[in-house]
Amino acid sequence: MPTIAQLIRNKRAPKVKKTKSPALLFTYNSLHKKTTKNPSPLKSGVCTRVGTMTPKKPNSALRKYAKVRLSNGFEVLAYIPGEGHNLQEHSVVVIRGGRVKDLPGVRYHIVRGAGDASGVEKRRQQRSLYGAKRPKKEASK
């Protein structure tokens, strides 16, 4: 426990919280070639690679991911949620924060239904997460 004199001499330093999605914190000014801190919830980017990855130890699957070059110059790995996708190299996508626990290095999710990423077909529940439109009502008899 510090004494009062020690606290006067040297104040308590606030704890610095480290962000879990650092690529969303910055924007790039191409006119001045400078990166500035300007956090945003979403960022757009272009897919440079689309592929599958196997998850960590207890799980087994082929998870779809894309390597995305963001508008601020960062290059990140983003998970493609839902069943089936239409993404390929040079597709324009929007990413949000949110890691995938069993994929190392994947800290972002691609937003379905935004940019070139289409919504999930035949999705009935939790549609907003997957960019699926509301199904048309069938004619009642």
UniProtKB/Swiss-Prot annotation:
Part of the 30S ribosomal subunit. Contacts proteins S8 and S17. May interact with IF1 in the 30S initiation complex. PROSITE patterns: RIBOSOMAL_S12. It comes from Ureaplasma parvum serovar 3 (strain ATCC 700970). One of its GO terms (molecular function) is tRNA binding. It comes from the Bacteria. GO terms for biological process: translation. This is Small ribosomal subunit protein uS12. Belongs to the universal ribosomal protein uS12 family. Residues 115-141 are annotated as: Disordered. One of its GO terms (cellular component) is small ribosomal subunit. HAMAP family: Ribosomal_uS12_B (MF_00403_B). The modification 3-methylthioaspartic acid is found at residue 102. CDD domains: Ribosomal_S12. Keywords: Methylation, Ribonucleoprotein, Ribosomal protein, RNA-binding, rRNA-binding, tRNA-binding. Gene3D superfamilies: Nucleic acid-binding proteins (2.40.50.140). The gene is rpsL. InterPro entries: NA-bd_OB-fold, Ribosomal_uS12, Ribosomal_uS12_bac. With S4 and S5 plays an important role in translational accuracy. It holds the Pfam family Ribosom_S12_S23.
